[in-house]
Curated annotation (Swiss-Prot):
The gene is MADS14. SMART domains: MADS. The keyword Transcription applies. It comes from Oryza sativa subsp. japonica. This is MADS-box transcription factor 14. GO terms for biological process: cell differentiation; flower development; positive regulation of transcription by RNA polymerase II; regulation of transcription by RNA polymerase II. The keyword Transcription regulation applies. Highly expressed in sterile lemmas, at intermediate levels in stamens, and weakly in lemmas, paleas and carpels. GO terms for cellular component: nucleus. CDD domains: MADS_MEF2_like (cd00265). Keywords: Developmental protein, Differentiation, DNA-binding, Flowering, Nucleus, Transcription, Transcription regulation.
Length: 246
């Protein structure tokens, strides 16, 4: 037969209760020492009997050190729990505020769109109308400003294009002028070149005069002795002249 589960309850018999306390206390102190030695743990055990007698155990007999450490830990834990509780409360409060603000904004947006106006009275409708008129004024003012800026930008571009056009027209006129001068120069250049070549050739080949030379064979000596000199003009042949003028 297996051992059944023992129900824990207060021992009514005073003597039996005292004997049980003595046995369990000794076993508890022994277990505290074992866990301290085996597991290198800091253990502090405090027991008060029904008569108020103190029984204690502390690792390395440093009860004050362990209790001080316990107090620091307990205080830090309490502060952390308190801070978390305050933070959670603040977050809940902030959430409620933001939620109400979002609902108000959504409601105002619907009113501006002309929706859900049944809940508004005459004064609220007048305020809404004034708000819409002010909004329209700001919108129109901004629209006019943008249109004016656009017009100024177009005028600036127009002026820039006009200046570029003037520069291009000036360059075109100069180019046409140069081309006209070039054509005129090309037309006059052949005549000037021909006249210069003919003049230079005539200077290089002057007319040759032959006089006072002895008579060639077959001529009459009397004609020579008569004292009349013979002048012979030697000119260029026609083919050479046509070549020079050509």
């Amino acid at each position: 037969m297996g051992r059944g589960k023992v129900q824990l309850k207060r021992i009514e018999n005073k003597i039996n209760r005292q004997v049980t306390f003595s046995k369990r206390r000794s076993g508890l102190l022994k277990k505290a020492n074992e866990i301290s030695v085996l597991c290198d743990a800091e253990v502090a055990l405090i027991i008060f009997s029904t008569k108020g007698k103190l029984y204690e155990y502390a690792t390395d007999s440093c009860m004050d050190k362990i209790l001080e450490r316990y107090e620091r830990y307990s205080y830090a834990e309490k502060v952390l729990i308190s801070a978390e509780s305050d933070t959670q409360g603040n977050w809940c409060h902030e959430y409620r505020k933001l939620k109400a603000k979002v609902e108000t904004i959504q409601k105002c947006q619907k009113h501006l769109m002309g929706e859900d106006l049944e809940s508004l009275n005459l004064k609220e409708l007048q305020q809404l109308e004034q708000q819409l008129e002010n909004s329209l004024k700001h919108i129109r003012s901004r629209k006019s400003q943008l249109m004016l800026e656009s017009i100024n930008e177009l005028q600036r571009k127009e002026k820039s294009l006009q200046e570029e056009n003037k520069v291009l027209q000036k360059e075109l006129v100069e180019k046409q002028k140069v081309q006209k001068q070039q054509v005129q120069w090309d037309q006059t250049q052949p005549q000037t070149s021909s006249s210069s070549s003919s003049f230079m050739m005539r200077e290089a080949l002057p007319t040759t005069n032959i006089s006072n030379y002895p008579a060639a064979a077959g001529e009459r000596i009397e004609d020579v002795a008569a004292g009349q000199p013979q002048h012979v003009r030697i000119g260029l042949p026609p083919w050479m002249l046509s070549h020079i003028n050509g």
